[in-house]
């Protein structure tokens, strides 16, 4: 119980039950646990106990989502938010796909309820997402060899898989590209799954270090999980060629590793759902067992709906059934069951021939706008930079991100001087850039590259 000290104009105002001698606790200056409050002629000093949470330290801001908070606080009219990977229109406004609006209207017309989904999610969604990934007639689907359950977008789906690895592959290591998406390491750390890195980005060429990648995958302990970006590598935008994917599959098979794909941009990288799934389908055709996490944040713009899936391709239908049962067991205490709204949107869009065609057209439009902006940025850099630097790496990258090659100090200059908000590894999201601001961004990049070391 907190102690009190009352200072009154007349001691006769003290309550009878309070002993005046017991009130001599000192002042707030001499006792750090006392706080003084004044009420007219009465001063009350309260002893406050230390918080039980004193040992909890302040967490650092998220390196990606924290960029948006800093951007919002900036009042400069030329500011650009190129940090978070979210699609914007040419006017730099959020975009809700027309086909998503149609799917939502359909749900309203039908009067869909808000009842709980099963632990594994919406059956129509799970069927649709597996078919989008592998193709409707693929043997893994026909033979029921893929365990698919709905997850909380890409992050939640990765986390489910990480928990499965921790439980059933004790001591196994996940090997991650260097660099990779900022949340990958957090997810495996949280699941207590050890990880290491394989070489991926070559700063000298601002391209793929393919030889280093292959060498490191070969050196990984046999049976490691090799985390691969299915398309539009984040943060570099650098993807292996089809021939290089074949070599990657060869090495993973030779070493008895388990591939683990993160597919966050299917259809959003090239504009084609099938082309962006080619790497995953290559591994499936070889009869390999592997994981695939999916997200619909980018290709359907369902960022806030948290809609995705984890797929585990197995060698038999029996194994897939058992894997699915354990994924459900993991999900139950973690979040119980997934949200229905986004799952119904995906199921409606994929299940309707007209809406599916409209979705593909909108994806092509979004991917096309990013390609146009990428070309315009390159053209602006070439025309403005008289140093002779080769900027062609920008055109060789794919998807919504570009790895500029800028270091932390140069990235800081982009923000501090030019009000261009980006992650400190030099990644920019071209989805947040307009044609009108390409020249301004080119000026910022040229200044930061040449004048900041």
Curated annotation (Swiss-Prot):
Its cofactor is pyridoxal 5'-phosphate. Its main location: plastid. L-aspartate binds at residues 85, 181, 234, 427. It catalyses: L-aspartate + 2-oxoglutarate = oxaloacetate + L-glutamate. Transmembrane segments: none annotated. Changing residue 342 to E: In aat3-2; loss of function. In eukaryotes there are cytoplasmic, mitochondrial and chloroplastic isozymes. NCBIfam families: PRK09257.1. This is Aspartate aminotransferase, chloroplastic. It comes from Arabidopsis thaliana (Mouse-ear cress). The lineage of its organism: Eukaryota, Viridiplantae, Streptophyta, Embryophyta, Tracheophyta.
């Amino acid at each position: 119980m907190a102690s009190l000290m009352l200072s009154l104009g007349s001691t006769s105002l003290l309550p009878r039950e309070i002993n005046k001698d017991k009130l001599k606790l000192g002042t707030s200056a001499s006792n750090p646990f006392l706080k003084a409050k004044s009420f007219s002629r009465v001063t009350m000093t309260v002893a406050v106990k230390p918080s039980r949470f004193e040992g909890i330290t302040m967490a650092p801001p998220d390196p990606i989502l924290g960029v948006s908070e800093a951007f919002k606080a900036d009042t400069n009219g030329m500011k650009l938010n190129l940090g978070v990977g979210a699609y914007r229109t040419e006017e730099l406004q959020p975009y809700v796909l027309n086909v998503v609006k149609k799917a939502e209207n359909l749900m309203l017309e039908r009067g869909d309820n808000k009842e709980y989904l099963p632990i594994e999610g919406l059956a129509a969604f799970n069927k649709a997402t597996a078919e989008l990934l592998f193709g409707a007639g693929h043997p893994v689907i026909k033979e029921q060899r893929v365990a698919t359950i709905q997850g909380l977008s890409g992050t939640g789906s990765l986390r489910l898989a990480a928990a499965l690895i921790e439980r059933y592959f004790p001591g196994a290591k996940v090997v991650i590209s260097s660099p990779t998406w900022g949340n990958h390491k957090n997810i495996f750390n949280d699941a207590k799954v050890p990880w290491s890195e394989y070489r991926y980005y070559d700063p000298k060429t601002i391209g793929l270090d393919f030889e280093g990648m292959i060498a490191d995958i070969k050196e990984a302990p046999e049976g490691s999980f090799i985390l691969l970006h299915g398309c539009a590598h984040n943060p570099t935008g650098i993807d292996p060629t089809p021939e290089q994917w074949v070599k990657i599959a060869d090495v993973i098979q030779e070493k008895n590793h388990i591939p683990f794909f993160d597919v966050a941009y299917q259809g959003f990288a090239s504009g084609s759902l099938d082309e962006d799934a080619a790497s995953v389908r290559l591994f499936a055709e070889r009869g390999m067992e592997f994981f695939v996490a999916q997200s619909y944040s980018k290709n359907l713009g369902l960022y806030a709906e948290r809609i995705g899936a984890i797929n585990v391709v197995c060698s038999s239908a029996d194994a897939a059934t058992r894997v699915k049962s354990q994924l459900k067991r993991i999900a139950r205490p973690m979040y119980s069951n997934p949200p229905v709204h986004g799952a119904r949107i995906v199921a409606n869009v994929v299940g309707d021939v007209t809406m599916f065609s409209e979705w593909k057209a909108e994806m092509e439009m979004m991917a096309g706008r990013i390609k146009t902006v990428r070309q315009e940025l390159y053209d602006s850099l070439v025309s403005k930079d008289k140093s002779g630097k080769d900027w062609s790496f920008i055109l060789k990258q794919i998807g919504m991100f570009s790895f500029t090659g800028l270091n932390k100090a140069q990235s800081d200059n982009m923000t501090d001087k030019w009000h261009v908000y980006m992650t400190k590894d030099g990644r920019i999201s071209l989805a947040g850039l307009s044609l009108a601001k390409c020249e301004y961004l080119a000026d910022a990049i040229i200044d930061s590259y040449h004048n900041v070391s």
